[in-house]
Amino acid sequence: REDGSLLYHLPSVIDDIDEKITNIIRGEDHISNTAFHIQLFKSLNASVPKFAHHPFLTDNEGKGFSKRLGSLSINRLQESGYENITILNYLLNIGSNKDIIADKNISSLINNFDLKNISSSNPKFSIDVLKSLNKDILQSFNFDEISDRINLICDDLVDKKLWQFTKMNIDFFVEIKNWVDIIKSEKNFMKDTMDAKLIKAAIESLPEHPYNEDTWEVWTRKIKDLTGLKGKDLFMPLRKILTGMNNGP
């Protein structure tokens, strides 16, 4: 250049030679550059790396990334609560002819990755698919695998049984703290529910300790018989009483 700085091509090739690069994977916009780079490698009497070019990601409608979607860097996804292994799963399989499934084993993911499975068409990035995959990944963790992380944010308040319940109702790991706060808290949510008849029936029909897997069904059946409520008319206000939430399990 006029300012004395070097163009991209020669420094790139020299750097690859110096670092003994054997395989180069880059975007399809570099296809024309690759032919030129191969000639540079040969002119410098260097081994020519193997090249592969991947198609560009598009949004869910097949359009180029907008500035909004362009902000979805790996760091931003991590900050938003996506598990590292979720991101790795998604990136290794998006655009391939394989179904994206929850796999926590990094060695398995690496061994099963094959560039031949990558389609030449532009893959569509879907935040909904990524979120669903993150949920599947979390559900695949047993308590022993994740207990240390749980204790860091929940102060040893979560045991194996509680994890088995909460992991079915979270999209992101940090949400477990919300459930611990609800379950362990003594906050009274009944004042937020206007149905006095339902509250009275719920209190009067509450089964005695100890509670088990059948308690919920037995209890809600009694409330239904006492109030005549059913479906969402029963479960939505009951959820509000128990958790303070309008949506959830």
Regions found by a protein language model. Name each.
Residues 65, 69, 73-154:
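A conserved active-site cap/scaffold subdomain adjacent to cofactor or substrate pockets
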Residues 1-53, 58-65, 73:
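Active-site cores that bind ATP or allylic diphosphates and position pyrophosphate for catalysis
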Residues 238:
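Hydrophobic, well-ordered secondary-structure elements that form the walls
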Residues 137-229:
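Small-residue-rich helix-loop
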Residues 245-249:
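C-terminal structured interaction module
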Residues 79, 122, 227-234:
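Secondary-structure capping and boundary motifs in well-ordered enzyme cores
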